[in-house]
A protein has these predicted regions:
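Arg/Lys-rich, glycine/proline-spaced intrinsically disordered segments
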Residues: 27-29
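Hydrophobic alpha-helical connector segments
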Residues: 82, 95-126, 178-185
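Small-residue (primarily alanine) positions within well-ordered alpha-helices
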Residues: 40-41, 166, 182
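Short, basic, alpha-helical segments at the C-terminal edge of helix-turn-helix-like DNA-binding modules
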Residues: 85-91
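Helix-turn-helix
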Residues: 36, 40, 44-78, 82
Length: 219
């Protein structure tokens, strides 16, 4: 990154007020941390959903101006995609670890408990960003809904492959369809996300997890 007019802009920060040389010349530009700004945007999207989050709410939470948002992150859709990347990296990392469990039931347990922890935590909004943003999407935000669905499909494919392996290893009966098991698990998780977002107590959702594991086929 080029140095600012005062010759000392850190490479870790993006200056505000650089929309024109005239503005910059009037005083030292303000600075913001893109990672912190993106985390703030994620929080807004998580609470409000894609369409429910207004540009005014986003810029206020991020502590930046609208021109600076566009310059750093692109439009609202582009910002949401970046927030979704951050969400998957920081909040859904438990899924990759879950796939390494020695049994299919162990995979399901890690996923369900990881999902419950994220959806009912004390520091983040309740519910699931993907579910919130697809359920509430209108036709105008179809590309966002398609993006979230495509990402979920990729995750489901990895889970289906793990369950295929589990069936081949005799982890559960041959009559069980791995893809149907993925659909079942996804339905439980999405239902849990909707209930968490609506304020259902964590204890109730823990009962749902326990019941799901009790009726889980196989070992």
């Amino acid at each position: 990154m080029k140095a600012g007019l005062d010759g000392g802009v850190s490479q870790h920060y993006i200056p505000l007020g650089m929309e024109s040389q005239t503005q910059a010349a009037r005083g030292r530009p303000r600075e913001f941390d893109p990672e912190k700004a993106l985390a703030a945007a994620l929080n807004v999207f998580w609470r409000r959903g894609y369409e429910g989050a207004s540009m005014a709410e986003l810029t206020e939470a991020m502590g930046i101006t609208k021109p600076s948002l566009y310059a750093c992150f692109g439009n609202k859709e582009s910002l949401f995609r970046k927030a979704l990347d951050l969400y998957e990296r920081d909040k859904l990392c438990y899924i990759k670890t879950a796939l390494e469990a020695p049994t299919a039931k162990g995979v399901a347990e890690r996923i369900l408990r990881g999902s419950l922890a994220i959806q009912t935590g004390t520091t983040d909004p309740h519910g699931c960003l993907g579910v919130i943003s697809t359920v509430a999407c209108t036709a105008q935000a179809e590309s966002i809904r398609d993006e979230v669905i495509a990402r979920r499909a990729s995750s489901d494919a990895a889970l289906a492959a793990r369950f295929e392996r589990a069936r081949a290893e005799g982890d559960f009966p041959e009559s069980i369809d791995p893809q149907a098991l993925v659909t079942y698990l996804s339905a439980i998780m999405q239902g849990m996300a909707v209930q968490a977002g609506a304020g259902t107590p964590r204890e109730k959702l823990e009962q749902l997890v326990e019941t799901t594991l009790t009726v889980w086929p196989g070992k």
